[in-house]
Each structure stands twice: as structure tokens, then as C-alpha cells.
Amino acid sequence: NEGIEECSLLVSKILKKSGIKSEILRLGKNAAPLVYGEVKSKNNPNTTLLFYNHYDVQPVEPLDLWDDPPFSGKIIGNKIFGRGASDDKGELITRIKAVESYLKTYGDVPCNIKFVIEGEEENGSENIERYLKKYKKKFSCDGVVWEFGYVDQKNRPIIGLGMKGLLYVELIAKESVRDVHSSFAVIIKNPAWKLVRALNTMRDENGKVLIKGWYDDIMPLSKNDINLIQKEP
């Protein structure tokens, strides 16, 4: 948790300097502060886009593997090197500066813009649900852009349609209560093959999950979704 409070204040300060109204939201001593930012559109006040980012980073150890101090932000060529440069401070500052440039150029934004910048993403966002419940109205929006993005080999932005989840499962198969000689393989079943058969019931050769009910809550792509995907280069 080193530097969490200081970093949240710094991010809020950067937002304000960029013309974005900002405040620090809190839940208590055991939760990292959340930085909130907002710009209201004059011409399109009924549509809101929210950017999600985080200001916390992974630990810097082992330090001896770094060529330069991890928080030096050293620039080599046109790239910044340092802890959090790509996860997730680089993306965050890019979005902030994009909004700042738009405001300076046009004096307005194309729709309401909101920023939700948390400080616990790297340890599982353990309090984000509490923040969402407490500040539901403040965080309301029509669409969310997640924390990062990619470009392809031709430097074209890649549009992601979602994020995968994580599921940890431990499978245990048992047969003999003690270690036995391989010569008994014809009469004592090998539990490893039980695991192989179990795994084979979970997913087919094309990657489709075979577990009953797995896709029940998945919304199918609409015709418009498919048309947009087909138009992508």
C-alpha cells in the first residue's frame, strides 16, 4: 500500500489541471481511495461515457532486474519505461490528455465524460463493488471503456468486445491408498486417466465449454454487432 494516498491525490490534481472536475471518494481506512473525474457536455448532456482505470501497480521487486529505477519514467526513443507505464498509467494519462486537448480545441466534449480510477485493481479490486453500490448514481453512464487498449501490427486500434474471467478449480482423483508398482496397472486403475476423462468432458476440440449452463447468461451478438465486426479491417 505504499504511496496509495499520495498517488490518488496526484491523479486528482492531474485531472483538475486538465480541466476535469475531480474528487477523492472514500470508504474508510481499509479501502484505497477512488479518484473520480467528470466533464459535462454542453451540447450532448444526455449521453455519458465512463473511463475505468487504476493508479496502483504491481510490486517493483526484484529491483536488481531493472536497468533504471522503476519509477524514473525514463524515455527511450518514443517509449516510456517504468513500473505502471503500460499497466495502467500510460493508458490513463493518454485518456486524460485526450479530453484536455478536446476541451482546448472545441471548448466542449462530445458527450459527458466520467473517470473512475481505483487503487486496488492489482489485488483483485476487493472494494470496487462497495464503491459501485455507494456511488451508483454518480457512476451511472451509457458505456464504459476499460483500462487499456491495443494496436495491431499496422498501428491500428483494436476494439475489444469483452474481458475473460478467471476460474480456479482443483480436481482430485484417487484409487489406491498407497503407492504401488507399475506391474499392478492391469488391475489397479490409474487416477491420472480419470482426470483426463474429466477434463475431456469440460471442453471440446474447438474450445467450446461443455459444462451445463455455462453460457446461460451470455447475450448473443445482434445483427448490428455482427455487421460492425465485419466492417473492421
How would you label these PLM feature ranges?
Residues 15, 19, 103, 139, ...:
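Structural signal for hydrophobic packing residues in well-ordered secondary-structure cores
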Residues 1-85, 104-111:
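Acidic/His- and Gly-rich active-site-bordering loop/insert found
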Residues 136, 152, 161-162, 181-233:
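Acidic-enriched catalytic cores of C-N bond-cleaving enzymes acting on peptides and small amides
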Residues 53-55, 77, 119-120, 147-149, ...:
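Fold-independent oxyanion-binding glycine-rich loops
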Residues 36, 114, 168-172:
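Beta-strand secondary-structure signal
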Residues 86-162:
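Acidic/histidine-rich catalytic neighborhood of metal-dependent amide-processing enzymes
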Residues 81-82, 177-182:
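Short small-residue beta-strand/loop micro-motif enriched in glycine and branched aliphatics
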